[in-house]
């Protein structure tokens, strides 16, 4: 009888430990998935805000019949991405400047790097030409 009680206690302990481990794994997995959903939602919200902002800039330029203007490199990237058609992989944007640093090159197959997003565009930021490759 003593052996059966000991076996039952040991078995109960093993089962309880297994359930606790599974519960913790499930919590960790759920937490990981939840964070992934939050990140995806934040990225979608940011993309929507960027799209609205670029639409506003482009409509304003179209209305005034002026060249597209960009304040930051991120604005340039989003304008080029919006104007690109087909299977375009790279774009070179020339700014009206007549200076040595009036070209910006973008790889449209990848998102813009974080360290380039807030760089100010030279001169007034008017786009002279865009060449796609």
From Swiss-Prot:
It holds the Pfam family FPRL1_inhibitor. Its main location: secreted. Keywords: Secreted, Signal, Virulence. GO terms for biological process: symbiont-mediated suppression of host signal transduction pathway via antagonism of host cell surface receptor. GO terms for cellular component: extracellular region. Residues 1-28 form the signal peptide. It is found in: Secreted. InterPro entries: FLIPR, FLIPR/CHIP_sf, FLIPR/CHIPS. Belongs to the CHIPS/FLIPr family. NCBIfam families: PRK13033.1. May be involved in countering the first line of host defense mechanisms. Impairs the leukocyte response to FPRL1 agonists by binding directly to host FPRL1. Exerts, in vitro, anti-inflammatory activity by inhibiting calcium mobilization and cell migration toward chemoattractants. This is FPRL1 inhibitory protein. The lineage of its organism: Bacteria, Bacillati, Bacillota, Bacilli, Bacillales. The gene is flr.
């Amino acid at each position: 009888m003593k052996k059966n009680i000991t076996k039952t206690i040991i078995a109960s302990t093993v089962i309880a430990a297994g359930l606790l481990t599974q519960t913790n794994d499930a919590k960790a997995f759920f937490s990981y998935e939840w964070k992934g959903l939050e990140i995806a939602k934040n990225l979608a919200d940011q993309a929507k805000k960027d799209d609205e902002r670029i639409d506003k800039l482009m409509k304003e330029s179209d209305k005034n019949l002026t060249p597209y203007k960009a304040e930051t490199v991120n604005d340039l990237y989003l304008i080029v991405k919006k104007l690109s058609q087909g299977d375009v992989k790279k774009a070179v944007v020339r700014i009206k400047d007549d200076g040595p640093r009036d070209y910006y090159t973008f790889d449209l197959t990848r998102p813009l790097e974080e360290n380039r997003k807030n760089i100010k565009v030279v001169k007034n930021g008017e786009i002279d030409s865009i060449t796609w490759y």
